């Protein structure tokens, strides 16, 4: 006969193991742990992530704009960076090998630092104290998009992005979306994947048409820059019901051309 006490102990151990796995489990991009997720303010509308360790190891890292590398320098001991915005303020949440808080940052927990405006830092710390994921839907959206990519961003639909100039066309494009996201992989070449989900199938169709129109106009306006035109024409666009995906990939030469387009 099986010892009942032994069965009870086994059941208790299984329950504890399941609870431990549940506590560690989080629907988020690889590298984002529960403490990082709990530091995302609850009013976050736009969320981005950077796998700093992998980005620094990329052959293309030295070719990034100086401003981008200067942003990462104070976080040289960080391995992962989250950037959360409510449309007004941005807070950076960094996980790394911090013995003390990086310059201008606040250490929330061992190896976890936040920096930003005073209000955004207070919001991140207050959310951390609740122990709850501040943006579970955005992290879940990012989970598959960010797979194998060093840089990613997701945004709730209809949220104005903090962009100006020609980039402001993005806000008109995203007005009727439920959510949108983009991810970048830098290796010997570059891969970019963008996704947008319309509020309805009709909104998805209009998004695709508007995106194609914007790209056509941009190509026409760049006629004297054949490299740029070639890049634009290489973008692949496909739609499935409400979801529109656009992708671009190329080798080192394409990556160089794209990086030259980034403001210095």
Predicted features by range, described:
Residues 1, 19-23:
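Classical N-terminal targeting signals for secretion and organelle import
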Residues 11-20:
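Bacterial N-terminal signal peptides
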Residues 1-12:
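Bacterial N-terminal signal peptides that target proteins for export
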Residues 23-264:
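Soluble, non-membrane globular domain cores that form compact, hydrophobic packing
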């Amino acid at each position: 006969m099986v010892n009942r006490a032994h069965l009870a102990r086994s059941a208790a151990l299984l329950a504890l193991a399941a609870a431990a796995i549940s506590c560690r489990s989080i629907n988020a991009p690889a590298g984002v742990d529960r403490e990082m997720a709990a530091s995302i303010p609850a009013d976050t509308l736009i969320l981005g992530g950077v796998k700093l360790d992998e980005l620094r190891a990329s052959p293309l890292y030295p070719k990034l704009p100086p401003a981008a590398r200067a942003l990462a320098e104070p976080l040289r001991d960080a391995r992962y960076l989250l950037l959360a915005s409510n449309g007004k303020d941005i807070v950076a949440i960094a996980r790394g090998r911090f013995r003390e808080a990086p310059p201008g940052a606040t250490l929330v927990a061992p190896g976890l630092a936040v920096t930003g405006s005073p209000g955004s830092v207070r919001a991140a710390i207050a959310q951390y104290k609740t122990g709850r994921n501040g943006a579970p839907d955005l992290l879940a959206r990012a989970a598959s998009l960010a797979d194998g990519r060093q840089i990613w961003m997701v945004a709730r639909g209809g949220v104005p992005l903090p962009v100006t100039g020609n980039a402001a066309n993005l806000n008109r494009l995203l007005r009727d979306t439920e959510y949108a996201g983009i991810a970048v992989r830098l290796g010997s070449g570059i891969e970019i994947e963008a996704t947008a989900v319309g509020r309805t199938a009709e909104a998805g169709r209009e998004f695709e048409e508007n995106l194609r129109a914007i790209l056509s106009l941009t190509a026409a306006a760049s006629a004297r820059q054949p490299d740029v035109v070639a890049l634009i024409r290489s973008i692949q666009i496909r739609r499935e019901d409400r979801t529109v995906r656009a992708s671009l990939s190329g080798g080192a030469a394409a990556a160089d051309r794209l990086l030259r387009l980034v403001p210095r």
